[in-house]
Amino acid sequence: AKILWKIGDLIDANIDELAELETLDQGKPLGVGRWAEIPGAAEQFRYFAGLCTKLESSVIPSSIGYQPAGKRIHSYTLKEPIGVVAAITPWNSPLILNAMKLAPALCVGCSVILKPAEDTSLTAIRLGELCIEAGLPAGVLNIVTGYGHEVGQALAEHNGVDKISFTGSTQTG
């Protein structure tokens, strides 16, 4: 939780640089980055920093009337990391969309391979640097750049990827 909160703080502390990178990368007006996109990305990390301290496993008594052989049935939910998440993001709002995939996965303890859109990777690379500065351990976040039909497809087909979080075009599928 502390690392996620720190990432949010570092995003805020670097708002001008990140807004400029969004403008250079995507053409977004500086003002939009400064008043909406960059603060929104910081808030994603803070929201999940708060949430990850509240996630718990639980046992829920069953409300099923018929119990085979007279046994009581309980449902058990186990909150644990799913493993490696491949997060593939589009070009149109790079930093906030990267944050919306990265923060929840880190919150629940997953490692992430972040593949930003090939046209807008500057803020993703800088976000990776800020994550390291915040104390995220090496190897928890890996950023790979390249074309979707090459890198994205390789991630989607890789046996070491346990979950794919994808936002993109209908052309991709």
Residue ranges and their predicted role:
Residues 2-98, 102:
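N-terminal Rossmann NAD(P)-binding subdomain characteristic of aldehyde/semialdehyde dehydrogenases
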Residues 56-173:
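Rossmann-like NAD(P) dinucleotide-binding subdomain of oxidoreductase/dehydrogenase enzymes
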